[in-house]
Structure formats: structure tokens, C-alpha cells
Amino acid sequence: MEEVESIHKPVMLKEVIHYLNLSPGKIVVDATLGLGGHSSEILRELRGEGLLIGIDRDEEVLKLARERLSKIAGNFVLFNTTYDNLQNILKELNLSFIDAILFDLGFSSFHIEKSGRGFSFMRPEEPLDMRYSKDTALTAADILNTFSESELSNLFWEYGEEPLSKKLAKKIVERRKDKKFAYVGDLLEVIDEVIPRRRRHEATKVFQALRIAVNDELNIFKRALEQVPFILSIGGRIVVITYHSLEDRIVKNFFKSYSDKILPVSKKVIKPSIEEIKENRRARSAKLRVGERRENS
């Protein structure tokens, strides 16, 4: 368990706990449970009262989180599903409302360092999988080997905002005629041909685009957000941590669309401290937004 805690440092933990406005007896959802970094502290704040509901689509991660949370006194229940099933989960628990919900988007350090599923361009030997759940139909390799040139180009532009998306898509289609994509290294060979080495870090955008497409991340997130105003109790809080502009745009649009029900608690986006960024590189691109369920107007 010490290894799990060393792998995963929860981003903006102090800010999350503060803005969730926790107290004993509340019902709290961690929609992106991961390895339970945030949830561990949430459970402590509930002090044996109330309920923590944790959701994660990755069965392997959920198992590790369960082990971690079981060492803390408190009530929790975990669900191995996508977080757009919020209303169904509450129905199963005979609950109508919750008091707080957290979304910490993206993927965890575990997925990069321990999953062996090809989430990072730093692991050329890993298979091009990128699925959070084995129930997901398509792998990253499937997409690279079957999508048309225009579909690939649109994917890299829409989900990765990659300026060389057309050139990259063309090269991928050419390459797969001779050799199918199977490993991270196969994709890196093409990226090296298309994206200048001074922009090597830009491979991140390509991997981001594939990960989002494989797991349908943005659509699932939108569907989940649309349920929040109807399950959050009056005065309840929603806290969202995003890591790139596509996610953040969805959150901003959500607050705008539901301004009659959700009131931003902070007008400005909240960012991690310089100290945290030094200690945890994953926090460097994090943006936290928080809203509160208002009285029905």
C-alpha cells in the first residue's frame, strides 16, 4: 500500500477538501476514484458518518483503492462503472441527492507507471491499448489500424489540437499498409517522421487524442455533468479538476448552461501552488473550478 501512495499524489488535495465543504454525515461522490488519494482524506473528514461513493471504470485501480480505503474508519461503497451512471448509482442506493461531488479528470500516475497499457510515449515497449476498462471495445491500435485518414486527422485535431494532424494521419495510413500498429514504439516511429524533434513533447497531444477517443472521455464527462444539477442538494458543491483546454471548456460551458442552478464559488479558476507543482509535476496543468447548488429560481 505504501507503493500505491508513493505512485499517486492527489492533485490540489487541500483545495479539494476545502471547497467540497465537508462535514460529518454528508453524502459525497468521488466520480474519479483512482487510487483513492482524494477519497482517503474525504473519508477522514466524514469521521465515520455519512457516506462516500467512489466510482472508477478501471477494475484494477478500484481494487487497490478499496484496499486503501478499508484501512480508514468510515462508510464507503465503490462502483466499477463510468461516472455518467450517476443517477443509476443513486437509484441503486435509494438516494435522491448528494452533498458534494468531485471530478479529477484525466489519467493517473498508475496508468503511466504500472498499467502496461501504453498510455505514455515514454514506454515504447508497451502495447497500444489505452483502455481504462477491458469492456471498452476499441484499443488505440484498433483506431490506428482501421480509421480512415480523415477520421484520424479529425481525431488528432479535435481531441489533441495537433497542428500537424493531417500530415500525421496520412503517414499512419501509409505505414499500416506495410506493418500494423501494435506497440507504442510503432507510433513513435511515425511521430518522429512528422513532428520535429524540438517539438517531441508534442507527442503528448497525439497520445491524449487517442486516449480520449478510446475511452470516450469527453462525451462521458458531458453526460455526467448534465446530471449533477438534479442530484446535488441545495448548498451542495461540485469540484472539478481539469488538465487541458478541452476539459476546461466543457466545465465553463456547464456553468454557463446551468447558471440558474449552479453558482460559481470562485469567479477565477484556482491553480495549484508553486510548491505543489515542484513536488508533483502532474499538478502543473491543473485547473480547479467549483460551483454550489443554488435555490431553485
From Swiss-Prot:
One of its GO terms (molecular function) is rRNA (cytosine-N4-)-methyltransferase activity. Its main location: cytoplasm. Coiled coil: none annotated. It catalyses: cytidine(1402) in 16S rRNA + S-adenosyl-L-methionine = N(4)-methylcytidine(1402) in 16S rRNA + S-adenosyl-L-homocysteine + H(+). One of its GO terms (cellular component) is cytoplasm. The keyword Signal does not apply. S-adenosyl-L-methionine binds at G36, G37, H38, D56, L90, D104, H111. It is an enzyme of class 2 (transferase). It comes from the Bacteria. It is found in: Cytoplasm. InterPro entries: RsmH, SAM-dep_MeTrfase_MraW_recog, SAM-dependent_MTases_sf. One of its GO terms (biological process) is rRNA base methylation. The keyword rRNA processing applies. Keywords: Cytoplasm, Methyltransferase, rRNA processing, S-adenosyl-L-methionine, Transferase. Its EC number is 2.1.1.199. It holds the Pfam family Methyltransf_5. PANTHER family: 12S RRNA N4-METHYLCYTIDINE METHYLTRANSFERASE, S-ADENOSYL-METHYLTRANSFERASE MRAW. Specifically methylates the N4 position of cytidine in position 1402 (C1402) of 16S rRNA. Belongs to the methyltransferase superfamily. RsmH family. This is Ribosomal RNA small subunit methyltransferase H. It comes from Dictyoglomus thermophilum (strain ATCC 35947 / DSM 3960 / H-6-12). The lineage of its organism: Bacteria, Pseudomonadati, Dictyoglomota, Dictyoglomia, Dictyoglomales.
